[in-house]
Amino acid sequence: GEAKMVAVLRTFGDEVRETAIEEVNRICKGIGIAFACDIEVNLEEGYAATYNDSALIDLVESSATAELGESAVRHITQPFSGSEDFSFFGKLTGTPCAFMMIDAGHGENPVSLHNGKIVFDEKVMVSGVSAMSRIALEYLKK
């Protein structure tokens, strides 16, 4: 017989990611030995963790606050485990990064981003473009 397992591995840092991959391989090898079967591990390199530049985060936060008001900006301090290709931009180019999100959902019981029932408040796009423009202009002044 044959079995197939597919999983997504998300980590908050490169070192932890390397350790996790080593552990997946070690555990699979052990299972193969324990059950006298062949196990093949195929790992596809996905998206790495995004590292936010603290100075750039300060600029993004202050610019967005100046443009939209303090009540419209929320600093997220906990790591975010969404899978995002944004990390490659910073890693490949060596460019400082600051990941920000724009909340365009609304309602009492919001649904997740990838839900077919999500409804975006398109008026938020104006605020988002306004904030990003301000951020870009402030960045260019430095």
Where are these regions (language model features)?
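Metal-dependent amide/peptide-bond hydrolase catalytic core
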Residues: G1-K142
